[in-house]
Swiss-Prot record:
Its cofactor is FMN. Belongs to the NADH:flavin oxidoreductase/NADH oxidase family. It catalyses: butanoate + NAD(+) = (2E)-2-butenoate + NADH + H(+). Its EC number is 1.3.1.31. InterPro entries: Aldolase_TIM (IPR013785), OxRdtase_FMN_N (IPR001155), Oye-like (IPR045247). GO terms for molecular function: 2-enoate reductase activity; FMN binding; NADPH dehydrogenase activity. This is Enoate reductase 1. Homodimer or heterodimer. Keywords: Flavoprotein, FMN, NAD, NADP, Oxidoreductase. It is an enzyme of class 1 (oxidoreductase). SUPFAM superfamilies: FMN-linked oxidoreductases (SSF51395). The active site is at Y196 (proton donor). Enoate reductase with broad substrate specificity for different alpha,beta-unsaturated carbonyl compounds. Prefers NADPH over NADH as cofactor.
């Protein structure tokens, strides 16, 4: 292994290392570990890995006052469809999450759980095997031929969820949020980005409904806002957040190709700001930058340059977490962190650098990540990345 080939800059004297209040917590700095899918949970059961997960989160929360957002976790079995991603609905799952939350808190850092519902990005055959539906906003609006073939082969065609099923998903979000808070989490992040179920309702490419959940900008936003309102009522606005990817194309979303989507996200943010002015301000809004339109592309590939996320500041006046290719572009991180109430998320860099916050603070070189091990069921590429001192001792070079 080696260090990444770029010139880091010390960020200690920038806005990134100023404290900020998020919900009920006081962060020492604005470097955030965003949700990172790692596929190490046990199957069956979707249980966080009892051998490795606590150590993984302990390592990355070692700098006191750091905000950690967990990998996406399924609120219910129906929300899932990936065998090795964790859930938060069973006691067996929650028993492991409690250990993870304790490890993070023992480091004097903070933890938010991302609540993740796949919709049509699930594997239809996995769901069929478990007696579960293959859900989305609309019937049989598949991402592509492979997904269609998989669904038909497993006799589990894509199903546009009914109003009663929408209500059940909302109950699932609420139940999961309460369980996470009761287990010791500081808050929850509702995943409404990257082409997953809530994003499928927001985007007209996947939402072909003709009822009150489809058609207009207001209708397409209804499900998302109902989830937010229900979770806020259950655990408090200060413990609730949400993620969007306005320009993302992952999951065959429209991204920048459909100009109505900027208006769509501006509308949702405006509705959240209305609620904030009425005393229910979310802890933060998490935005994936157009610098990353798909999580499977290397740095600076797939960069959509026809728009920016700057519009958020005209609408939403609360905290903003911005995520996307900041590790190799410290100047962009410095510039964007000058915006009001802004935090910066580092994804792949946090995977490969357990002491990332200290490295960013001091301008130290970063470990090169190993992409093939991102989703590999092993400790390798998960809990064996060295700290800077360990890397130097091993002879790492650029």
């Amino acid at each position: 292994m080696s260090f990444m080939n770029f010139e880091p800059k010390p960020l200690a004297d920038t806005d990134i290392f100023k404290p900020i209040k998020i919900g009920n917590t006081e962060l020492k700095h604005r470097v955030v570990m965003p949700a990172l899918t790692r596929m190490r949970a046990l199957h069956p059961g979707n249980v966080p890995n009892p051998d490795w997960a606590v150590e993984y989160y302990r390592q990355r929360s070692q700098y006191p006052g750091t905000m950690i957002i967990t990998e996406g976790a399924f609120p219910s079995a129906q929300s899932g469809g990936y065998d090795n991603a964790p859930g938060v609905w069973s006691e067996e799952q929650l028993a492991q999450w409690r250990k993870i939350f304790k490890a993070i808190h023992d480091n004097k850092s903070f933890v938010w759980v991302q609540l993740w519902v796949l919709g049509r990005q699930a594997f239809a055959d996995n769901l069929a095997r478990d007696g579960l539906r293959y859900d989305s906003a609309s019937d049989e609006v598949y991402m592509g031929e492979d997904e269609k073939e998989r669904a038909i082969r497993s006799n589990n065609p894509q199903h546009g969820i009914t109003k009663d099923e929408i209500k059940q998903y909302i109950r699932d979000y609420v139940d999961a949020a309460k369980k996470c808070i009761d287990a010791g989490a500081d808050g929850v992040e509702i995943h409404s980005a990257n082409g997953y179920l809530l994003n499928q309702f927001l985007d007209p490419i996947s939402n072909k409904r003709t009822d009150e959940y489809g058609g207009s900008i207001e209708n397409r936003a209804r499900f998302v806002l109902e989830v937010v309102d229900a979770v806020v009522d259950a655990v408090g606005a200060e413990r609730t957040s949400i993620r969007f990817s306005p320009y993302g194309v992952f999951g065959t979303m429209s991204g920048g190709s459909d100009p109505v989507l900027v208006a769509q996200f501006a509308y949702v943010l405006a509705e959240l700001e209305k609620r904030a002015k009425a005393g229910k301000r979310l802890a933060y809004v998490d935005l994936v930058e157009p610098r990353v339109t798909s999580p499977f592309q290397p740095e600076f590939e797939g960069w959509y340059k026809g728009g920016t996320n700057e519009f958020v500041y005209s609408v939403w006046k609360g905290n903003v977490l911005r995520v996307g290719n900041y590790a190799l572009d410290p100047d962009a991180a410095i510039t964007d962190s000058k915006n009001p109430n802004t935090l910066i998320g580092y994804g792949r860099a946090f995977i490969a650098n357990p002491d990332l916050v200290e490295r960013l603070e001091k301008g130290l070189p970063l470990n090169q990540y190993d992409r093939p091990s991102f989703y590999k069921m092993s400790a390798e590429g998960y809990i064996d990345y060295p700290t800077y001192e360990e890397a130097v001792a091993k002879g790492y070079k650029k």
